[in-house]
Amino acid sequence: MKKSFSYSSNELSKPKQFIINSIEKISGRKKLEKLYQQYDEESRAPHLFWSDVKNLLKLKVNIKSVQQLNIPKKGPLIIIANHPFGIIDGIILASLVSEVRSDFKIITHQVLRFTEASQQFILPVDFSAGQQALKNNVKTGRNAKKFLQEGGVIILFPAGGVAMAKKIYTPAIDAEWGKLLGSLSLNTDADVIPIFFDGKNGILFHLFASKLKSQTLKYSSYMHETKRKIGKTIDIYCGEVVPNKKLKLINDKKQITLLLRDITMSLPVRG
């Protein structure tokens, strides 16, 4: 069963739903949906969905670092990354993990649950305001912890939202990373692999999205950026595995998060 590929939902007000749908229609949603309609999810193993989507979008991944991506075939693992592009980031990381393992989940916006093939791999983040959103996100954190304790892989973008550039020609920088990363490191035995995406969204995105206060409205503009990436090569840098034992020695969620952010952001410098 295929669902609407949209950031709009019934939980939003009617005016906001209208605005989001309008933005998406003029910025690439139809193109993405048409591509997906060519895909028969029932003929493939569920975890291969992500590689198939990457191929549908004709995306290529270029690892620029000397260090290659070394995902262990078993055991708890957290894969973290900066978040410059949006939907593309999640698709690429999930596709890379799926080449080695099928026991993984992504903490991300529920828009990627638009098909049964993807639903089982998504731990949704609720970007709406209010107590219910808080409860939903606490539940996602607990589910992530449980999944790691069972030996699975969690893909996490600790900044939550997509990186923004303060000025048009400056780099896009992640917002402050949340404490979930530190919490998961302290409360599980998961090692961490950092990955850095090289690049940022287009000028129009940063001009437009920076003016929007609503996180959901910002997300609706990602459709255009996803369409722009069709057929492109995405450059990434991979880091060495950070052992869980090293992180537990720090014994502070905030400091663990800061350390892992510094490691991730320095990957291009290390080469």
Map each language-model feature to its residues:
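Residue-level detector of flexible, active-site-proximal loop/helix-junction positions
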Residues: Q68, V111-R113, A129, G199, ...
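Non-catalytic C-terminal accessory region of glycerolipid acyltransferases
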Residues: K2-S4, V138-G271
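Short, charged beta->alpha transition segments
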Residues: K60-L69, T108-L112, G141-A144
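Catalytic core of membrane glycerolipid acyltransferases/transacylases, capturing the structured
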Residues: K73-K74, I78-L134
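Short, flexible loop segments at the rims of nucleotide/cofactor-binding pockets, characterized by
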Residues: K54-L59, G130-K135, T170-P171
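Hydrophobic beta-strand scaffold residues
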Residues: V61, F104-I106, I154, V192
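Membrane-anchoring hydrophobic helices of lipid-metabolizing enzymes
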Residues: M1-I80, G90-I92, R101-D103, Q119
